[in-house]
């Protein structure tokens, strides 16, 4: 009997030392380097038209270069944003320049492409310099960000915890982005 009491006491004492695994935490997207490249597919739906194609976005050193191509790989538009402003190249047209992307794309395309905000949103983060509302999903990752009149819905995350599918929308415009690959530049 005494032996049973010693074993029970020992088990109780050791049980108090047992560690409990912490609850699982949401997968936090791996921060990208200051320079990165995103390749994927893009769909744009406006009240007048529906477009689809591919996107190659290089970001780094205060410069964004966005190349939009048709599903067959032909260049449709090239947007370059740097500290001096932004330029837009469309086939068969002179290069257009402006101080900001919103104005330039609105004038040239008839709708704004939020390149400055997208640089943050595609990383599942709001622009830290602007007010935003962030709704988290059950997994603790952003499910929706609302910022600057845009709503960003995160439909799927990749194995690396980075957004894979997202929808960016505002009245009369919906942009669907599927990130096929991310690369951090050296």
Swiss-Prot record:
Plays a critical role in the incorporation of lipoproteins in the outer membrane after they are released by the LolA protein. Residues 1-16 form the signal peptide. One of its GO terms (cellular component) is cell outer membrane. This is Outer-membrane lipoprotein LolB. GO terms for biological process: lipoprotein localization to outer membrane; protein transport. Belongs to the LolB family. A lipid is attached at residue 17 (S-diacylglycerol cysteine). It is a lipid-anchor. Its main location: membrane. It is found in: Cell outer membrane. A lipid is attached at residue 17 (N-palmitoyl cysteine). Monomer. InterPro entries: LolA/LolB/LppX (IPR029046), OM_lipoprot_LolB (IPR004565).
């Amino acid at each position: 009997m005494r032996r049973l009491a010693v074993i029970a006491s020992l088990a109780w004492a050791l049980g108090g030392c047992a560690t409990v695994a912490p609850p699982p935490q949401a997968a936090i997207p791996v921060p990208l380097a200051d320079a990165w490249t995103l390749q994927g597919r893009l769909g744009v739906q406006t009240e007048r038209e529906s477009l689809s194609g591919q996107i190659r976005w290089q970001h780094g050193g205060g410069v964004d270069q966005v190349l939009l191509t048709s599903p067959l790989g032909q260049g449709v538009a090239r947007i370059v944003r740097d500290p001096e402003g932004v330029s837009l190249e469309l086939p068969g047209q002179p290069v257009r320049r402006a101080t900001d992307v919103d104005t330039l794309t609105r004038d040239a395309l008839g709708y704004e492409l939020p390149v400055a905000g997208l640089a943050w949103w595609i990383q599942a983060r709001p622009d830290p310099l602007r007010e935003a509302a962030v709704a988290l999903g059950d997994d603790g990752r952003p499910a929706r960000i609302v910022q600057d009149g845009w709503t960003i819905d995160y439909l799927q995350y990749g194995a690396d915890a980075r957004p894979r599918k997202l929808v960016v929308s505002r009245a009369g415009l919906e942009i669907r982005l599927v990130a096929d690959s991310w690369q951090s530049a050296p």
